[in-house]
Amino acid sequence: PFINAAGTYTMLTASLMSQETMDAMEYASKHFVHLTKLQDAVGARIAKLLSAEAAMVTSGAAGAMTVGTAGCITGTDNKKILQLPDLTGCKNEVLVQKTHRYGYDHAVRAVGVKMVEIETEEEFRQKAGPQTAMALFFNDADKRGKIDAAGWVKLGKATGVPTFNDASADALPVERLSQYNKMGFDLVTFSGGKGICGPQ
């Protein structure tokens, strides 16, 4: 055992679950459920709580990044969905600020996309094109980049590129859970195993 004085880092098991959460997990483990219906119901409830268009519980923030990227590539086109990870005929680029590159962007690259690094608003506009599936923003690096969160959203709207904010470690205070959605990000992920204190 050790004392975690660093915070909710994944490699340090992020957070500890409450007894209420443990009791709910034990209760759930004793019942069969229709998973698709459960996912839909939970997503609808979370979306309502956050005033969001939709919500989804995934295997974790990294899983959400993979699923979100895939969704930006395929939309609702079943043919494209079934051909993944083959990106033939699909958008295959994701814009990202150079200062926002980090280990977990592998969850985006795992879909098969090419990360296109940019630094300025002008470069964003120049690089955004018909092959651009998404623009990834790493919330923890907000102060390191030349384009802040609001500017990233504005550029995404202006170029028609969906914006994704990885705010996995930034669930608290609770107002943040709807802040980035209200700001205009198309997709936002939070880690349930960090500030929300769910399973890691």
Provide a role label for each language-model segment.
Residues 37-42:
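A short, well-structured juxtamembrane/interface segment
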Residues 2-36:
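Glycine-rich phosphate-binding segment of PLP-dependent enzymes
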Residues 1-12, 43-55, 62-200:
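Conserved PLP-enzyme active-site core in the AAT-like
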